[in-house]
Regions:
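Short alpha-helix
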Residues: 48-66
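A short glycine-rich, Lys/Arg-flanked "PGG" loop and its adjoining helix->strand segment in the class I
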Residues: 2-17
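Glycine-rich loops and low-complexity Gly/Arg-rich segments
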Residues: 12, 42-47, 93-99
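Conserved Class I S-adenosyl-L-methionine
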Residues: 65-138
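Alpha-helix N-cap/loop-to-helix initiation residues
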Residues: 1, 26-27, 79
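Conserved class I S-adenosyl-L-methionine
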Residues: 17-49
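Short, low-complexity, polar/charged sequence segments that are solvent-exposed and flexible
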Residues: 8, 37-40, 88-92
């Protein structure tokens, strides 16, 4: 990752900006919303190793003066979907935790079945972090 950041630095024009937009390195919360009321059901247990490595790489190039941190903002991001779309969305995560994913699907399906209301949807909550980095002349 550090190599990729150095390559980005190489191709950016002087004082160019790099926008680093990634999910925050926290486990996402999974719940359902019924008629506008949210209820958390579970916390995902996805691997955060890649997130930690990316954060470390960005911190390293900032510390070395390759880039300067201009600003950082964290915003809540709610991924909203129909129940039928949840298993497909979940399949985007590494499949080394297939049993946990199946259990999570069953929990959400059961909550949907038991919930009383007209408008039901799955909501996955987690932060997005945007860092704006400026190319420094090394």
């Amino acid at each position: 990752m550090v190599h990729a950041l150095h390559e980005t630095h190489r191709v950016l024009k002087p004082n160019g900006l790099l926008l680093d937009l990634r999910p925050g390195a926290v486990h996402r919360r999974v719940g359902i919303e019924v008629d506008g009321q949210y209820r958390q059901l579970a916390m995902m247990n996805e691997s955060l190793e890649d997130d930690y490595a990316a954060n470390q790489a960005v911190a390293e190039v900032i510390q070395k003066g390759v880039f300067k941190l201009v600003s950082r903002i964290q915003v809540n991001c709610n991924r909203v979907m129909a129940l039928k779309d949840f298993p497909n969305w979940l399949s985007d995560f590494p499949n080394d935790r297939a049993a946990q994913q199946e259990r999570l699907i069953r929990i959400v399906e059961h909550a949907f079945k038991e919930a009383k209301g007209n408008r039901k949807r799955v909501v996955v909550k987690g932060p997005l972090v945007l860092k704006v980095l400026r190319k420094d002349q090394v």
